[in-house]
Curated annotation (Swiss-Prot):
One of its GO terms (molecular function) is rRNA binding. GO terms for biological process: translation. It comes from Rhodopseudomonas palustris (strain BisB5). Gene3D superfamilies: Ribosomal protein L9, C-terminal domain, Ribosomal protein L9, N-terminal domain. It comes from the Bacteria. This is Large ribosomal subunit protein bL9. One of its GO terms (cellular component) is ribonucleoprotein complex. The keyword Endoplasmic reticulum does not apply. The lineage of its organism: Bacteria, Pseudomonadati, Pseudomonadota, Alphaproteobacteria, Hyphomicrobiales. Residues 181-194 have a biased composition (Acidic residues). InterPro entries: Ribosomal_bL9, Ribosomal_bL9/RNase_H1_N, Ribosomal_bL9_bac/chp, Ribosomal_bL9_C, Ribosomal_bL9_C_sf, Ribosomal_bL9_N, Ribosomal_bL9_N_sf. Residues 156-167 have a biased composition (Basic and acidic residues).
Length: 194
């Protein structure tokens, strides 16, 4: 089916372009959401009359999106999750979790605006894209950690795994010095027998 795009659609085209799409995509997504019109002669004339109004609305929406983009550009949100010692999460961080973190910071973003290829499954700092408008995308970082303190260390650039190795080395040094429990050692007092 041929349609006329009423706004920019990712991986499809710009506003006003005549594109050929599968019938189901047009009927179930583009037409009901007002993103396109069927490419009939009457609709082509209708689009030409609406073109100036659509462009004005697009400019207004883009300006509002630019304000939101300025507010969140480079922003860092923290998501706390349980994880193993190796940094693998017990579960994952999805788009819904990221939206919830933004809402906690007072920023209104929808799930469809976050461009995340696959759920996040490891501890660390991850960069994702947020499309606040079809023509405006910004990068934000998501810090996934087991605690707020660990998130702060990750944001400072500390390597969490090397810190664990340092703790293990300190424990081995204490053990080598002989400051550990000896099960064969004599006790000072013997318990009373009954």
């Amino acid at each position: 089916m041929e349609v006329i795009l009423l706004e920019r659609v990712a991986k499809l085209g710009q506003m006003g372009e005549l594109v050929r799409v599968k019938d189901g995509f047009a009927r179930n997504f583009l037409l009901p959401r007002g993103k396109a019109l069927r490419a009939t002669a009457a609709n082509r004339d209708k689009y030409e009359h609406m073109k100036a109004d659509l462009e004005a609305r697009n400019i207004e929406a883009k300006a509002e999106a630019a304000k939101v983009a300025e507010k969140i550009d480079g922003k860092n949100v923290i998501v706390i999750r349980q994880a193993s010692e190796t940094g693998q999460l017990f579960g994952s961080v999805s788009v819904r979790d990221i939206v919830t973190s933004f809402e906690a910071d007072g920023v209104k973003i929808t799930r469809s605006q976050i461009l995340l290829d696959a759920p996040i499954k490891t501890i660390g700092r991850h960069t994702i894209e947020v499309a606040v408008h079809p023509e405006v995308e910004v990068g934000v970082s998501v810090t996934v950690a087991r605690s707020v303190e660990e998130a702060e260390r990750i944001n400072r650039g500390e390597d969490i795994s090397s810190r664990r190795e340092d703790q293990d080395a300190a424990a081995e040094a204490i053990a080598a010095a002989g400051e550990f429990f000896d099960p064969d050692a004599q006790q000072d007092e013997e318990p009373e027998q009954q």
